[in-house]
Amino acid sequence: MKCAVLFLSVIALVHIFVVEAEEEPDSDALVPQERACIPRGEICTDDCECCGCDNQCYCPPGSSLGIFKCSCAHANKYFCNRKKEKCKKA
């Protein structure tokens, strides 16, 4: 009888730890905006929002007046190093 109680206690403890591990939020899931990026052609506000090293947030003339919107566009090969420095995550 004592063995049955001990066995059931062990099963209950294992179950509790498994449930707690499943309910614990993943640290990566807490900040989805860091992983999210904007594809080429979509509206952006900063270079760091655009996907890839070779994309920049291009604002055409008139965008400061609200006539045009800034969007992710292809950048030259030298832009990649500047973007890496600018968009470093602390």
Swiss-Prot record:
It is found in: Secreted. Residues 22-34 form a propeptide. Expressed by the venom gland. Keywords: Calcium channel impairing toxin, Disulfide bond, Ion channel impairing toxin, Knottin, Neurotoxin, Secreted, Signal, Toxin, Voltage-gated calcium channel impairing toxin. Coiled coil: none annotated. GO terms for molecular function: calcium channel regulator activity; toxin activity. Negative results: does not target TRPV1 and TRPV4 channels. Potent blocker of nociceptor cation channels TRPA1 and high voltage-activated calcium channels. It acts mainly on P/Q-type (Cav2.1/CACNA1A) calcium channels and has a minor effect on L- (Cav1/CACNA1) and N-type (Cav2.2/CACNA1B) calcium channels. Blocks glutamate release in synaptic transmission mediated by calcium channels. The toxin also inhibits the KCl-induced increase of intrasynaptosomal free calcium. It also shows antiproliferative effects on different glioma cell lines (M059J, U-138MG and U-251MG). In vivo, it shows analgesic effects in rodent models of pain. The presence of a 'disulfide through disulfide knot' structurally defines this protein as a knottin. Belongs to the neurotoxin 09 (Tx3-6) family. This is Omega-ctenitoxin-Pn4a. It comes from Phoneutria nigriventer.
